[in-house]
């Protein structure tokens, strides 16, 4: 790009080079950018609520291991992003939130929709006060390399100014992630070693590289456990894979191990539960890895010598469905492809899905694992679907949601309908919010009819298989409403 150009044009040129899809909702203070994106090569997905834009960007980021971008106007548009950005912050997801602002001369002067926008800076935010493309590049780099959400707040009068540093066309032009974490560990010489793998092992690997990690890990001569978001990084059917550990997983293996080698886990209270936390921390060795290529990861494990490990640990805590709710979840899981991307909301359905699903590939389950956000499921599954399209990921997308969470962002069914997104959307209708209280529900099937989305209603568990098989043969969305009885959750490890 040469010559004198406006900041708006330079910004969209940068976005075109680095982004395929943006999730947005228009508004006065962001309208110049919104309109310019509409005329670009970027897919501009208009959501029906800014919360949907944030959650879609989050789902997109999680499946692609890249950046998900959302766009919202100033004031109420930006405040609607608060919960999605908080979710991305807690769950370590690369979401870039581009927000509008009034003209600079009105900032701090009680102007229409003007508020301090720092509330979105959970990790970091940039107030763009100069027409410099470097702001955008820095925001991209911070977002991608640190796996955290970043806000880019732009006053509306800045778009007309002449752009500076237009030679910057991608985030790598100004940001070189040359950091090579130093790991002194070369050998592991204990009788009962255990590897704990968290999602940090994904680094900045591409999706195609991430799915190859299992082949590397299966050669390690000791048990391997994972955190919730890292499930499937090693196939849970393999002999040396324990699977999920912690609050909703196996705890005995962590206690029996002589040493725990942690790669990529933040060691949250979901993984190291409070009752044994200090004991587990005392025997944990943390390895800092931020792999930028699968080759780098392969070389690390090839040079790591695991000595004297004859320990074979079998996870005997496999949960079996026993009630109406868990049996119906299990029937859904049995009838979808084993590599399907299951997106859950927050609630009982998430716990049962977690307990009943054997994960065979990374991102087999995507959930708000650290923030527990209701309303996450539907828009996140939409973002996941767009991610699979943009990055040629040939996997089915399945939403399993509760009735309470589904209603929180039900308006985003319009995005599903407009784009004919093939998503299997399951609503577990038990007419309650977990064990908290009973709720009254609308007719979900009539809601689907209003959006002109195919739908069905299921009462009996033996109806589930045929409906899913029929769906898999078609190329359009389906909403499945599953009437179910309540069922108490098994007690977690605490």
UniProtKB/Swiss-Prot annotation:
Example of a GO biological process term:
L-valine biosynthetic process
* Keywords assigned by UniProt, alphabetized: Thiamine pyrophosphate
What GO CC terms are in its UniProt record? acetolactate synthase complex
Q: Coiled-coil region(s) at which residues?
A: none
User: What are the protein's GO molecular function terms?
Assistant: acetolactate synthase activity; flavin adenine dinucleotide binding; magnesium ion binding; thiamine pyrophosphate binding
Source domain of life: Archaea
The family classification in the record reads:
Belongs to the TPP enzyme family.
- Classification via PANTHER family: ACETOLACTATE SYNTHASE CATALYTIC SUBUNIT, MITOCHONDRIAL, THIAMINE PYROPHOSPHATE ENZYMES
Identification of the protein by name:
Uncharacterized protein MJ0663
- Say which species the protein is native to: Methanocaldococcus jannaschii (strain ATCC 43067 / DSM 2661 / JAL-1 / JCM 10045 / NBRC 100440) (Methanococcus jannaschii)
The upper taxonomy is: Archaea, Methanobacteriati, Methanobacteriota, Methanomada group, Methanococci
């Amino acid at each position: 790009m040469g010559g004198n150009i406006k900041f708006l044009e330079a910004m969209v040129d940068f976005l075109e080079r680095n982004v395929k899809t943006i999730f947005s909702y228009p508004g006065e203070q962001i309208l110049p950018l919104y309109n310019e994106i509409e005329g670009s090569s970027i897919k501009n997905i208009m959501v029906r609520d800014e919360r949907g834009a944030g959650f879609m960007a989050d789902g997109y980021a999680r499946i692609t291991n890249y950046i998900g971008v959302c766009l919202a106007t100033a004031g109420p548009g930006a405040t609607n992003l608060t919960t999605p950005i908080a979710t991305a912050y807690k769950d370590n997801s690369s979401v870039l939130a581009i927000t509008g602002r009034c003209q600079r001369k009105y900032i701090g002067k009680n102007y229409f929709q003007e508020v301090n926008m720092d509330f979105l800076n959970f990790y970091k935010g940039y107030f763009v006060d100069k027409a410099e493309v470097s702001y955008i590049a820095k925001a991209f780099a911070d977002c991608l390399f640190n796996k955290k959400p970043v806000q880019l707040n732009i006053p509306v009068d800045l778009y007309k100014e002449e752009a500076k540093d237009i030679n910057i066309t991608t985030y790598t032009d100004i940001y070189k992630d040359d950091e090579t974490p130093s790991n002194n560990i070369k050998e592991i010489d204990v009788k009962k070693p255990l590897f704990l793998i968290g999602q940090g092992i994904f680094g900045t690997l591409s999706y195609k590289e991430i799915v190859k990690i299992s082949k590397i890990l299966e050669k390690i001569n000791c048990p391997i456990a994972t955190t919730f978001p890292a499930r499937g990084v090693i196939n849970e059917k393999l002999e040396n894979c324990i699977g999920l550990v912690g609050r909703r997983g196996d705890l005995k293996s962590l206690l029996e191990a002589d040493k725990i080698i942690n790669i990529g886990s933040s060691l949250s209270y979901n993984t190291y539960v409070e009752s044994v936390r200090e004991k587990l921390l005392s025997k944990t060795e943390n390895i800092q890895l931020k792999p930028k290529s699968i080759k780098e990861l392969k070389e690390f494990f090839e040079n790591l010598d695991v000595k004297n490990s004859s320990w074979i640990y079998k996870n005997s805590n496999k949960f079996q469905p026993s009630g109406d709710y868990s049996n119906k979840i299990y029937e859904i899981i049995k009838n979808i492809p084993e590599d399907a991307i299951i997106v859950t909301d927050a609630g009982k359905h998430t716990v049962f899905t977690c307990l009943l699903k054997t994960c065979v590939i990374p991102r087999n389950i995507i959930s708000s694992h650290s923030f527990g956000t209701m309303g996450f499921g539907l828009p996140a599954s939409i973002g996941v679907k767009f991610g699979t399209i943009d990055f040629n990921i040939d996997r089915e997308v399945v939403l399993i949601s509760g009735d309470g969470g589904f209603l929180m962002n039900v308006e985003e069914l319009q995005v599903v309908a407009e784009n004919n997104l093939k998503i299997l959307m399951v609503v577990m209708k038990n007419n309650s919010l977990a064990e908290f209280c009973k709720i009254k529900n609308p007719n979900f099937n009539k809601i689907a009819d209003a959006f002109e989305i195919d739908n069905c209603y299921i009462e009996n568990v033996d109806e589930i298989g045929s409906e899913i098989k029929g769906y898999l043969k078609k190329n359009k969305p389906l909403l499945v409403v599953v009437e179910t009885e309540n069922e108490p959750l098994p007690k977690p490890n605490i």
